[in-house]
Amino acid sequence: MLSQYDEQLAAGDNNGFNKQGNATLYSFDFVDADDFLDSISGALPNNGHNNVNPNTNDISFEDMNIMNPNIYSPVSAASGDDFTQSSGQPMISEGSNYTGQNFTDYLSDNSLEGYDKNTSRPLHEVDIGFSNKRSNSTSTGSLSHNEEITPISHYSVDSIVTSPEPPINKQGDFPPIKRTTTVSSTNSITNTTKKPAKVTKPKSKDKNSHNMIEKKYRTNINTKILALRDAVPALRIAAGCDDVSIADLEGLTPASKLNKASVLTKATEYIKHLESKNFILKQQNIELHRLIQHANMNPKSLPPPPQQMQAPPQPGFGFYPPQNQSFNVTPASQYPSPQQQVSPTQQQTVHHPPQPNRYLLGGMAAVMGTSLFGGSGENDFRSLSALPFSYLFPNAILNPSPLTIQLWTLTKVLLVVGSLASIFIPMYKQAQLKKEDKPNTIPETSLLDWILISIGFKTPAKLSVSKRDAIISNLQGGNDWSQLVSDYFYLAGCEINFENCFLSLVLGTIIRHRFPVVATILNHYLSMKEALLLNLDYKGFSKSLIRLNQLISKVDGVSIFESTNLTTRLTNVFTNNRINANIVDGQNHVKYIEFYQRNINDYYAIVFNWRLLEFIHELNVTYLEQLNDDQSQVLTDLKIIEAFFGEQDNKLFGYYQLFTSILNANYAPYLFESLKDKVESSLEKFRIAYEGIDLTDHEIHNTSSEDEYEQESPVVYKYEPTLKSQKSLISSLNLVNEEEFIILTCSLTIYYYKNKEYDRALKLLNYLRLDNDSKTLSLLTFTSLITLINELIPGKIEDNVNLDSAIRICRDWLENPDLTQYMDEDIKLELKKIVVTKGMIVNGIDVNESDEE
């Protein structure tokens, strides 16, 4: 049976969805879905109404530690009763409270990741991405945790506009989930408890084989520990080696014991010591390279070599510390820091040779300069006739002509200019040498440089990695507007590529948002940058920039810089304000905080994820606007952005799954499998974080170097508690929030209702015990509720208390102006009509079809 969404999908993509008319729906176990909804029903705030067990009447959960689902990264303080196994032995001592690190820290622990990849049991493999028919491209939709695959790594134009097919029961692709028989397992456990335990002595052969494996395992570990001990000087001294002395420790203390803990501790200490020593040597090497480059650039100004001084002894094996120096001194104190190292050019005073005749030339220039103002040049020749040898001078000098007088005046002027030049030119050269001696710094592009680059009189500069990091660091909480404006002009004068244009547009958009006065001037330059950005390809290796480049060039265009909410959030991050301050859009704001914290070291990933969340929000509003109309455009847009929701990003893909399950209830089984796997994996990691990793006989055997396998004793597996028995723990850790629970329940109910399994749909609907407070509902949650009442009313299960509560909550939500101020009045009016009409039907009031429409 196809829903209205399947028909729209078929209309939108004939090649991919026309074959679904005769296909059966994806089949999965209803008992699993029922048990899972029962175990996560604590996600709703009114837990007193949620503890409903349809199968048994003697089970109640009165002491559930319900956390607020709207709090990000909750810390559980569950009591020891929440961790009790069926055997009656609590995992945590009774009466104690868990006060360890946050549960999110447990999930990010390296040891847990290693365990999850190697030793934990595999999760259920469910094809989440769904098979698509694509031309010239191949795509796989299986749920994968491979960190190296990105949604753009196999990107093509065809693959980006394909849509996931609704989940159908294809033989081989979607095998039905096996039904778990909880009754038989319960009976077997009951029988074992009634009969007395029979103690049997194991066979000697099996016991000997097991002991041999353990012995080889211990021998292998001890051998590696001994090899590690011989590699650390502090341990070799404690072991009594003769080739190592106290001086070889380089300031480290020798070990007092040789147990395994001491070996690992001293080995870690020695590794850190070597890293510190390596860092200091690198700094010295960099300083020497700098001095060599400076000497090659200025060979004439190189000062004489400094006086030879005794070099400090280099640490190493055979090095004895100076007198009165403790061995506990860290090796870093034995080396001068880069700030303390003074280059020879700074130690030597620059001595310039004296400038003889400088004052003499200055006096001559002054005398000749004053003679220029003494009258005409004839006075300089009149005194020549008084000389006793005046008869030797020609008549042209004694009685000069006007031309001779002019030539003499010009000669005096040139002599004065030459004298002044001989004074000031050496002073200028000396000032230039002082500038060259200063360390070279990267000059920042000023406003004048930007103007020169704009008119083509200067070549653009290249954006260095350090400058780029400084710009991004200022964007993430710098709160320095003057630096932000300076960075904008700097980027405007840099070479043109995708990253520079994107950063320049981000800076310009934030400035325009903060200072609307300059918007008129900035819009011209920003429009030019936007036109360039659309035609630029990113050729680097940053995955976030690759995805941003594909998103802008294929889907979003320059609309990303026109988003007011995105610009406001980026401005809030820059000014160290709350991320969602001054924003009311009906979204789950916790999602934005989660993605910011997960990508705090990648600014481009933050912008990318936030923009995808806005895509879902915009499609959500469009879906509500066309709730009873043709929704093919919404599904087409959802197909376009599908490729960007990579499965390696579980958070982002999970949010995409929630919205997809609302649009098409046939995706509800995949959402159920995804949430169930997440809960089971989180519970397993939580158990491992508390109990530690248990090594089985098989793991012990695999770690040994034995090549031949011997007969082993059968492995006895530990009892794994069911999800039902861990209901309180699930709610305490907030593994499933209120939004996920409501959407999953609504989607599964619609799924069974459209499959004409009304009893099962009604049974799942009973878990939807909603709170009367509508202020905590996000837009996505409201969409799932209004879709539920729109699909089930009128129908065979319309007479239900939970449906009546959903109608009341939807009506209150629409009448709250604080929650719907971003919506058009026409959309709100149409939604109110739908809710009122459904409420009248539930209350038994006859409604004509024309009125209902």
Curated annotation (Swiss-Prot):
GO-annotated biological processes: biological process involved in symbiotic interaction; cellular response to copper ion; cellular response to heat; cellular response to neutral pH; filamentous growth; filamentous growth of a population of unicellular organisms; filamentous growth of a population of unicellular organisms in response to biotic stimulus; filamentous growth of a population of unicellular organisms in response to chemical stimulus
KO phenotype (gene knockout): Impairs expression of hypha-specific transcripts and leads to a medium-specific impairment in hyphal development.
A GO cellular component annotation in the UniProt record: nucleus
Record keywords: DNA-binding, Nucleus, Transcription, Transcription regulation
SMART domains in alphabetical order: HLH
Residue ranges constituting the bHLH domain according to the UniProt record: 205-274
One Pfam family, short name: HLH
Protein name: Transcription factor CPH2
Organism, as annotated: Candida albicans (strain SC5314 / ATCC MYA-2876) (Yeast)
Designated gene of the protein: CPH2
